Amino acid sequence: MAAVKYKLLKDYVPPIYRQQSVSLEFFLDPEKTILKSKIQFSRDNGIPTDLVLQGENILLSYLKIDGKNIGLDLLTFGKHTLVIPKKFLGPRDFQVEMENILDPSTNKTLEGLYLSEGIFVTQCEPEGFRKICYSLDRPDVLSTYTVRIHGSYAHMLSNGNPITISNNYSEWRDPFPKPSYLFALVAGDLIFDEETFTTLSGKLVKIKIFYQKEHIGKANHALICIKKAMAWDEINYGREYDLDVFNIVAVDDFNAGAMENKGLNIFNSKYILYDDETSTDSDFALTEAIIAHEYFHNWTGNRVTCRDWFQLCLKEGLTVFREQEYMEDQLEKEISRINQTDFLIKNQFKEDAGPLSHSARPTRYLEINNFYTATVYEKSAEIIRMLKKIIGREKFLEGMDQFFKNQDGCACTLEDFQKDFELVLGKNLEKFFKWFHEPGTPKLAISEKFVGKNYKVTFRQEKPINHLKYSNKVMPITYKILNSKGQFLQPEKTLVLDQKTTSIELKNLSKKPAISLLNSFSAPVIVEFKQSIDDLFAILEFETDFTSVWMTKKKLDYIALEKIASDQPNVENIISRVYEILINKMDKRSLLAKLLEPLNDNEYFSRLLETTTPDPKAIQTDLRKYEDLYKRYFKEFSITYFKSFIHNRQYLRENSNYQERLLACALIFLNRGTNFLDDFLDIIFNTSNNMSLKVSCLVNYIGRNDKKENIKKFYLQYGKNKVLLNKWFATQIQYSTPKLAFDRLRELTTHSDFNMFNPNNFHSVIGTFAKRNFHAFHQKDGSGYKEIADWIKKIDPENPQIAASTTKAFEQIKFLPNIYRKKAKATLNTLSKGNNLSKDTSEILNKIEASL
């Protein structure tokens, strides 16, 4: 077996050759697309060397240099490269002209040029362009592009501005130099909706969203969102759109959520097509967030791009943070922050604790596709949020202006970003930027003392779980101090902790107060603080920061579960007091809905692994006991609420707002597995015109023999809608008991509407089983592990990205009891041996196996 060769950050070498301009001419055919390319190269000063181009599975017909034909037998073809000897190259500038043949119809990887239901689509980030054309496929080589597309399709699109649009060909020119990963082409019999936007400088931009005709009427929300994002970026960051057109295409077969190709964004259709009756309220918000994210990339990613893929944290961290700021302005700011924090803890904290942990800016990788992670995206965004909190909004925007000014049109590094901010601030930021360079979630240990009339709180940094190396970080700790009556003894303050330990002190107090920590989750840390239950109750009742209230409720959940797990008394005292506090928050329905969300198995497992070896069976038993107690306390509240909800016909979209529906859905979910709401739910399921409520009812019906017809009815009514079909698939898998989940898995994967090569289908069934049905996956006999390993083996040869993503379901096996680890290890060992797995999947698999 050949030694694994990692790419290392320290090995970066600037390119000797540059691509000044790229001209591509496509003659589209599903099975035999011909591409003629002309690339103008220049060589930087230095000794001439061979020209090494990247390319995979490319059938080259001919190659010319400055018009002179070069025999293919004089070139060196590697598995992923084409080497042109230096003797054929010009002294400084020269043109390479090539023709190659592609077969989009057989491309199941969904990278490069492929077909999605008859539509030609490309995906080039990070290294897909090399599957289209031999080139310098690296992000620090920026070129202008001219693209001509021949074919008999209604619309043939590429980056930049249209030069010519005719019946049988189109031509596009992008005047802004870009790396190859931002190239895009789409062609097919699509229809479109359009709008216009006038920038602050007076430029008129045409906006079009292209989609298949079956989706007519579903692009209006997206068009509104694009215009809002454009205006927001102008007002908040001074960034105008720079092309004459902004096009988006929705396709059904797409590995990612969306892609920010310059002037031609490509979206997974589930994240952009929306209508009031068949989309949920969360779909509404998610569509807006993803549209904003991809649009904001126009500056943080496109105009300013990455020098190499180790800098991915910069473009994605900045863009995720900007997207988060935007969404806080569009929806309820505090609820948005709860959702961001919830996602971070459930995904990034879990990643940081396991064998796939890595720094936000990694120093090595085997397969770059594997580093599109929660750490690179969400943790990087949290680091940038902390920077803004510490230096203030005004200085942060000055730093961003400096960054855009210095790096526009460049492929830059994290260090460039750091230097631009240092220039504005006049201070060294090296210690703060350590956040990007070390893996793991820091622990913040808190202790408090009340002696005499003095209250002292001490903060101490500790190393993360499973990481021996740790440098003390600079972090903002936002806090409030309140008494048991809800009076705040001082306004919100932010302590910048820049050493291992520090303290704050309040004097001349008559009684011990309570401290409410990490308001708005000001730093991505794990807090270790044995705070009294009375203090937690005071924070839950009186704190005005929603995120702190939400985190406090979680702490009380864990305390109650600890008591259940160890058969301690007084669990109901906690639940009773929480109930009394929560029912008085009806004026904050969105917050109440978030507080009513029960802990899920994965969440509880992640919490337990910090201190013990969690047993899946015990987790299930304890959580069910806890949920049953909660249901009992909230039963009358739920019945009373739904009587009013039904009486006022608030199940109709026009009679309610999303806050009201959010609370209704939370109560339905809280009471799943019961039947005392059935009369209300049947009315909602059969007559509501809001999909959030219908899907919540569907969740409640899973596993109930008396509700099988309702589950079937949902499919018959909405099965032709691909987004709802996948919700129907996923709901049956996620909320089934283990035995039923296995049955459903086999039933749904043989369903006539299931296509394993469609990423949305695969994730909704296989991915949901592996990652969202904790107890079905973690079976003592190892059957869940074997089931998923078999699917990984099936999909890996066709789509390595999906296979690698699914393999990550095994990342926390190391924390389970030995009986589970042994079964998983045997399964993974069988999977890794003799299957010739892709680099994507092997990298993930090897790291997990090494941890067992």
What are these regions (language model features)?
Residues 40-59, 134-137, 143-152, 415, ...:
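Surface-exposed beta-strand/loop patches in extracellular or lumenal glycoproteins
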Residues 172, 209-458, 666:
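Hydrophobic alpha-helical and helix-loop surface patches within well-folded domains
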Residues 17, 99-196, 221, 432, ...:
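Extended, low-hydrophobicity, Ser/Thr/Pro/Gly-biased non-transmembrane segments
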Residues 59-66, 428-431, 439-517, 639:
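Beta-strand-rich binding/interaction modules
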Residues 44-46, 50-116, 498-512:
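A surface-exposed beta-strand-loop module
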Residues 345-346, 374, 469-471, 482, ...:
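Long, ordered, helix-rich scaffold segments
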Residues 101-109, 464, 521-526:
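Short acidic/polar inter-strand loop motif in beta-rich domains
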